[in-house]
Amino acid sequence: FDITQKVGIDLPSESTSRLADRDYKKSWYQQNKDFYCNYKERATKAQQTAFLLQLAAENCVDGDKVRAGDAVNFSIGQGDTVLTPLKLTQMYAAIANGGTIWQMMVAKAIVKTDGTVVKTFTPQKLGTVKTAPSVLSFLRGSLREVVVSGTGAGVFAGFPVEISGKTGTGQVFGRNPNGSLKDDTSWFASYAPSKNPRYAVVMMVGQGGFGASTSGVGVKQIYQTLFGVVGNKVVPGAALFPEGKPPTKLPKISPATKPKEASK
């Protein structure tokens, strides 16, 4: 998925995702070795706990090594691996469409006030997922099962549109200003409909707790709006777009009305 590659969205200040592989571990060690080897002199009083002191001592000696805990974190996307919601959305869209990684875009065109189209923008193909089609097929089946009988089943029970997705609960270390422990980061990543996908929707809520109970509920509400779901039925007239399909054509823009001249 080229995780460290930006999605290329036409908005300023996009953040880069990070993959905590061996190269990252070595780079991180070079940048932080001096701090950990002089931890007692540089850490704040609140950071002088037995656990953090022991961690600093280990990081000073062999912080560039990939330990068993790092490998476990790497396998489930926790630890030092960091993804932006946009990047995860791009990844789920690629899984849904068969493996094509597309540049993400907001703008479709530049249009004058008189309706004249100055320039149109077409998304660019950034690459393809480097895996076998059978692996993508397995992933799609697994993501559907999450919503049918897994951790996403409860929130989408009786939903009339087939959703494929995955709950996520990112563990967080630390305390809030009031002294309470920080809650986990809630995630829900998805695409729909499962068989002929039109949308990829991802939600992340900082300190939101479990993925299904917080982000899953928010994603469900988004799909209700997109597809016009009322109760357990699809009501076409209630959809945000006709038949729940994203628009492909530019909207018609009427020429702007010329302002009246002030009377002399």
Question: Where are the regions that the model predicts?
Answer:
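Short, gly/Ser/Thr-rich active-site loops of penicillin-recognizing serine hydrolases
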Residues: 116-125, 216-264
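Beta-lactam-recognizing serine transpeptidase/beta-lactamase-like catalytic domain environment
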Residues: 1-203, 254-264
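A generic structural motif
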Residues: 206-209
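Short amphipathic alpha-helical face segments that pack within enzyme cores
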Residues: 84-90, 214-221
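A short, polar/proline- and glycine-enriched secondary-structure boundary/capping micro-motif
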Residues: 129-132, 211-215
